[in-house]
From Swiss-Prot:
Binding positions for UDP-N-acetyl-alpha-D-glucosamine per the UniProt entry: R94, D308, I330
Keyword Transferase attached: yes
A GO biological-process term: peptidoglycan biosynthetic process
Tree of life domain: Bacteria
InterPro entries the UniProt entry points to: Enolpyruvate_Tfrase_dom, Enolpyruvate_Tfrase_sf, MurA_subfamily, RNA3'P_cycl/enolpyr_Trfase_a/b, UDP_GlcNAc_COvinyl_MurA
Protein name: UDP-N-acetylglucosamine 1-carboxyvinyltransferase 2
Places the protein is found: Cytoplasm
EC number(s) from the headed UniProt entry: 2.5.1.7
Major place of residence: cytoplasm
GO cellular component terms, semicolon-separated: cytoplasm
Residues noted as binding phosphoenolpyruvate in the record, renumbered to the chain: K22, N23
Reactions this protein catalyses: phosphoenolpyruvate + UDP-N-acetyl-alpha-D-glucosamine = UDP-N-acetyl-3-O-(1-carboxyvinyl)-alpha-D-glucosamine + phosphate
Amino acid sequence: MKKIVINGGKRISGTIPISGAKNSVVALIPATILANDVVTLEGVPDISDVASLVEIMEIMGAKIERNLEEGRLVIDTRSVVSRPLPYGKINSLRASYYFNGALLGRFGQATVGLPGGCDLGPRPTDLHDKAFKALGAKKIQEEEAEHLEVIGDSLVGTTIYMDVVSVGATINTMLAASRAKGLTIIENAAREPEIIDVATLINNMGAQVRGAGTDIIRITGVDEMHGAQHTVIPDRIEAGTYLALAAAMGDGVIIENVIYEHLESFIAKLEEMGVGLTIREDSIEVHKSENLKSVNITSVPYPGFATDLQQPITPLLLKAKGRGSIVDTIYQKRVNHVPELARMGANISVLDDRIIYDAPNELTGSCVQATDLRAGAALVTAGIIASGTTKISNIEFILRGYDHIIEKLTAVGVDIQLIEE
């Protein structure tokens, strides 16, 4: 079993480069199926979710050239066929549901195992099902999978109102509708940068998507799509994770390859705490920060504070002075990091799905386990802050979403290693 071991309490300095966005690339790779051609993706992070997606694509018949050291995937989908996808790989991957939209759009049918990923409480796919049904597909629920197929000759554009703002459902609807007949309008669409990124790729492939990044998206379906080249946007969640770490333990750290506009609400909270920042065109310098103030955080859909960043910022909050709270309105059960931080000495608890902390706390190294991707990131930061040695298990969650995390942290002075036990 692989574990991460951190000897904490050491200040850090230097530069941390940000990789391509995990939450984009997990949709971009399935989206290439729509092209029936060769698509090149640049800036692809070297994470286990990408490896799983590549393996699934190859099972479907895609020919893929991988150079993840340079962040490049060349995907030829001309030989792809719609076939039942392997339950094991699908079950480990939340974003597997994007295969539904892509396969339905190109082939008019899809059979995909039920998605897995991190256990953050209920994340129903009802919105996806409702959208596919509105476009003219029916669902047949099987034991460990769902089968979708078009009723009639093809999907047909329509107006779809999202009852809840959902990134996954917005992207999935966009993928399927891009090959439907006529106009599809998505109302109450999610507005995340990753949606714009996916729309940019499929537009470059010949789709006609307008309004991505607003709450109304219009998609005019096309009969066929072609190859393209696309560079993945920087990962705003990885950037936020390292910004919080730099604020907690940095003696001057530069986070490179950042789009500031994607992180405005997060950066506003750092500044409210008293973190010193210099914002440049594509980088952010975090100055040594002391006498931090506690803040209250509520995660909401973009452009508000991202749910994926409420866990990574928590160790920084534990260095501030005063009492504060964290409320996650997206995933109320996203609190599994709390008992692990308490094990390290944090004065933190959960009350009615609200996280309450009293700070500052002196953290001490301990044996802890990552229960999901962003909880794992929080524990890495906590281990760097803590005195003594921290040993983190279940690190496969962390490797799902953080590209070369050991190497990046080692380069700025963190005593961290990956071990086999």
